[in-house]
Curated annotation (Swiss-Prot):
GO terms for cellular component: CCR4-NOT complex; CCR4-NOT core complex; nucleus; P-body. A divalent metal cation 1 binds at residues 40, 161, 278. This is CCR4-NOT transcription complex subunit 7. Belongs to the CAF1 family. It holds the Pfam family CAF1. Its EC number is 3.1.13.4. Its cofactor is Mn(2+); Mg(2+); Co(2+). It catalyses: Exonucleolytic cleavage of poly(A) to 5'-AMP.
């Protein structure tokens, strides 16, 4: 099978509090042979903007991320497992974790919740059957998925995605300074390829995840704007791009560990393409 070709026998496993332990056991087995993990999250938008003086636009973007991740809760996490050739494990390839979220008590941006509701996210079920993030973090820490240099993470414009994961895993607010954020990031996720960052070297590729997938002629499985389907599409995009634009080899020195819109990945500061969070928010719309 060519890398990242759609096979409709692949299925996305829904994970709630009731089946979390069972599915994490399966993941511990899967990750031994399928060590490329494509990741996406769904979160409740942006509700705050930092005030004060900032050293640079890049500093402002990190502080914007930090204040919102600190205030808000993750709604979904999607993890898709693939091997070096872009092949999936037999049966389930993607796990969609649904976290506890209460529309009455938790903060959110109204437009984001409306989009997620229209995409099929069941907020009543999240309130009643959602996963507790602290327990999820305990299981994830011993899963062989994080803190492991043999695992390669694939993402798309993922500053906020990794921000929420770091918040969950460390059970604390994000660090005040971006440099400390990247230090923690490298500890939990030593190898990351952000597809949006890779696109800088791919002629004519542009836009959000869905637009990129269409340009690459990839077929989505599952509903758009849900973390499982988006993580699966992110993994497909990485392997298709690696084949088409990188001769099946990614230069780690140039691309590994960079997140689009943050740190050295903040090319928008120089080229004037605007606010990185607005692009991140638009990623959910596209």
């Amino acid at each position: 099978m060519p890398a990242a070709t759609v096979d409709h026998s692949q299925r996305i496993c829904e994970v709630w509090a009731c089946n979390l332990e069972e599915e994490m056991k399966r993941i511990r087995q899967v990750t031994r042979k399928f060590n490329y993990i494509a990741m996406d999250t769904e979160f409740p938008g942006v509700v705050a903007r930092p005030i004060g003086e900032f050293r640079s636009n890049a500093d402002y973007q990190y502080q914007l991320l930090r204040c919102n991740v600190d205030l808000l809760k993750i709604i979904q996490l999607g993890l898709t497992f693939m091997n070096e050739q872009g092949e999936y494990p037999p049966g389930t390839s993607t796990w969609q974790f649904n976290f506890k979220f209460n529309l009455t008590e938790d903060m959110y941006a109204q437009d984001s919740i409306e989009l997620l509701t229209s995409s099929g996210i069941q907020f009543k079920k999240h309130e009643e059957e959602g996963i507790e993030t602290m327990y999820f973090a305990e299981l994830l820490m011993t899963s062989g998925v994080v803190l492991c240099e043999g695992v390669k993470w694939l993402s798309f414009h993922s500053g906020y995605d990794f921000g929420y994961l770091i918040k969950i895993l460390s059970n604390s607010k994000l660090p005040d300074e971006e440099v400390d954020f990247f230090e923690i990031l490298r500890l939990f996720f030593p190898i990351i390829y952000d597809v949006k960052y890779l696109m800088k070297s791919c002629k004519n590729l542009k836009g959000g995840l869905q637009e990129v997938a269409e340009q690459l002629e990839l077929e989505r499985i599952g509903p758009q704007h849900q973390a499982g389907s988006d993580s699966l599409l992110t993994g497909m995009a990485f392997f298709k791009m690696r084949e088409m634009f990188f001769e099946d080899h990614i230069d780690d020195a140039k691309y590994c560990g960079h997140l689009y819109g943050l740190g050295s990945g903040s090319s928008y500061v120089q080229n004037g393409t605007g606010n990185a969070y607005e692009e991140e928010a638009n990623k959910q719309q596209s």
